[in-house]
Design a protein with these regions (language model features):
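Gly/Thr-rich phosphate-binding beta-strand-loop-beta motif of the actin/hexokinase/Hsp70
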Residues: 1-24, 97-116, 158-161
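Short glycine-rich, Thr/Ser-proximal phosphate-binding strand/loop in the N-terminal lobe
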Residues: 4-39, 43, 47, 118-126
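Short beta-strand-loop/turn "lid" adjacent to the catalytic site in phosphate-handling enzymes
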Residues: 21, 27-33, 52-83, 110, ...
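Glycine-rich phosphate-binding loops at beta-strand->alpha-helix junctions
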Residues: 67, 209-232, 244-247
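Conserved phosphate-binding/catalytic loops in two-lobed NTP-binding clefts
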Residues: 81-82, 230-252
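Glycine-rich phosphate-binding/hydrolytic loop that grips phosphoryl groups
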Residues: 132-136, 242-270
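Adenine-nucleotide phosphate-binding core of ATP-dependent small-molecule kinases
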Residues: 171-204, 247
Length: 270
């Protein structure tokens, strides 16, 4: 009989659930976070159970993580986002030593040792610039969807518009001015991605970047931001195996840690 564990990651903008079945990744679920994190966690969990065709009693252990981890009322325990992302990234990409997690409302840089233990971390949670919310905000200003940003970035020659401000409020004014000056949308998007990369790269360099580097969070799906980060860091960012959603890394890590804790408590080896 398979040993199934679950990880629930309640983030600021999205909530995720992942199942770990024996030594492999099982079904995953993702949806928007709401003002009722308890209900959101339950809904996300039930969705992934339904996809797997199992019941709650079939899951040996559940761990919560993310901003809303304390609201995962059915969890056996919870862990920090740092530990969850560290474990998730390491199990998916064993060579990973630095994680750049660009979330909805903050950016984290996590440095790990060869075993995946967190050595150091840094966070930018004081300003929206350099986060997923910033990209959402500017995309709305431009009248496009977030999913269109990467395509726009690659749709023209590389001529990023200059955005002098590092504040999201002032950048909005700059973007509006650029639109009024009829600067091509692709160049504005390139400039916006460059602005995000400058802020994130500055944090990463302060931390003392160690390769291999991997990006997690929803912004990791934006090839334009990844391209700009590689330019600013001067390295090639690694990617997870095909089919693995970079937004799921925290939930996956929580599920793996849940398995390890369950085996330890039951006197078995992980």
């Amino acid at each position: 009989m398979s040993l199934i564990t679950a990880g629930i990651d309640i983030g600021s903008t999205t909530s995720k659930a992942a199942l770990w079945v024996d030594d492999r990744l099982g079904p995953c679920s993702i949806g928007p976070s709401t003002t009722n994190p308890r209900a959101t966690a339950r809904e996300c969990y039930e969705k992934v159970l339904q996809e797997a065709g199992i019941k709650t009693e079939d899951v040996a252990c559940v761990f919560g993580t993310g901003y809303g981890r304390a609201k995962v009322s059915f969890a056996d325990d919870n862990i920090s986002e740092l530990s969850a992302h560290g474990k998730g990234a390491k199990i998916l990409l064993p060579s990973a030593r630095t994680i750049i997690d660009i979330g909805g409302q903050d950016t984290k840089v996590i440095i790990m040792d060869a075993l995946g233990e967190v050595l150091d971390f840094g966070m930018n949670d004081k300003c929206a610039a350099g986060t997923g919310r910033f990209l959402d905000f500017i995309a709305r200003t431009l009248g496009v969807s977030v999913k269109e940003l990467a395509k726009l970035h690659a749709s023209a020659s590389y001529q990023p518009a200059s955005l002098s401000s590092m504040c999201s409020v002032f950048i909005e004014s700059e973007v509006i001015n650029l639109v009024n000056e009829e600067v091509p949308l692709a160049f504005i998007v390139q400039g916006m991605h460059q602005s995000v990369a400058i802020r994130v790269a500055a944090l990463a360099k302060r931390m003392g970047l160690v390769e291999d580097v991997v990006i997690t969070g929803g912004v990791a799906k934006n090839a334009g931001v990844v391209d700009e980060l590689e330019r600013k860091l001067g390295i090639k960012v690694k990617t997870f195996p095909d089919g693995v959603d970079p937004q799921m890394v925290g939930a996956i890590g929580a599920a793996v840690i849940a398995r390890q804790k369950h085996l330890k408590r039951s006197g078995k080896q992980a």
